[in-house]
Amino acid sequence: PRAEFQDRPVLKGIDLKGHPLCWHTVTAQWLLDLSNEEILAAQLDRINREVSDFKGIVDIWDVINEAVIMPVFDKYDNGITRICKDLGRIRLIKKVFEATRQANPDAVLLINDFDTSEAYAILIEGCLEAGVRIDAIGIQSHMHQGYWGVEKTLRVLERFSRFNLPLHFTENTIVSGDIMPRHIVDLNDFQVSDWPSTPEGEERQAQETVTHYKTLFAHPLVESITWWNFVDGRWLNAPAGFLRRDYSPKPVYFEIDRLVNEEWRTGPHTLVTDDMGSVEISGYLGTYELRLKDKTISFRLDKGSTEEAITV
């Protein structure tokens, strides 16, 4: 699989992320034929295989997904819930994080969950106290039942900021059609054959998504925002994409493009150095190009960096 990815030009400059390494949903049926010890061994082998094989290509991983509900998940029997009940959540989390870290010591490792309540925060606290090295906290925000609003988003940010770890909003969706009924507890239970995007819904989606992105971008610990469906209908048939089913762009596509590539973009600027050859710039974090006559030099503005020496 590595050979299929590493030479693709489309991947240049794009950070790839693996999702997920351990999850109780969509597990192999044959795990049920194994003992708990064998299930755990198979899970750790799987982690070593994937993380080692894609090292240098995929260096960000959701190590374990939705562990808050994992030991009490009862929709159907599965091997991962079995070993989570046996070991307990924190012990299982520690084992899968250690296996991932061993396979790729330089990878960024996340815990990820849809549960944004205090239960998730308590689990994270327990993991950190047990010595689990979590690099970033993954927060899902599937808003099929309506936009959270700024107040709820800020409450979630406040709850998980207490750990002073980077926050990754890993799974973001806002629909551009009818809102899913509020009484649905598990989003996966809402299965419809037709869930169209509407003109009114598309305008609402664009406005709410811009507000959501701006709220997250303004927080100093938010490091990543991942939109879950680029094209409508890709998960639960929901109209949650930036593109319609025919791949035509919706208003949200143009609004986020404007936000990221215009409002949150620095330059171009023409600058003149002082007598010492220095110049001061203020800009958004990221990669820049310095053009001086016939030379082009790339450099980065990273969090905490104040000086960059460039030789031309």
Model-derived regions, located:
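Aromatic-rich peripheral "rim/lid" segments of glycoside hydrolase catalytic domains that contact
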Residues: 53, 62, 67-90, 95, ...
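Histidine-centered active-site/metal-ligand motif
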Residues: 19-20, 66, 142-144, 219
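Short, electropositive alpha-helical surface patch
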Residues: 31-44, 75-76, 118-130, 134, ...
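Positions that flank functional sites
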Residues: 23-24, 142, 175, 231
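Substrate-binding cleft and catalytic face of glycoside hydrolase catalytic domains
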Residues: 2-108, 114
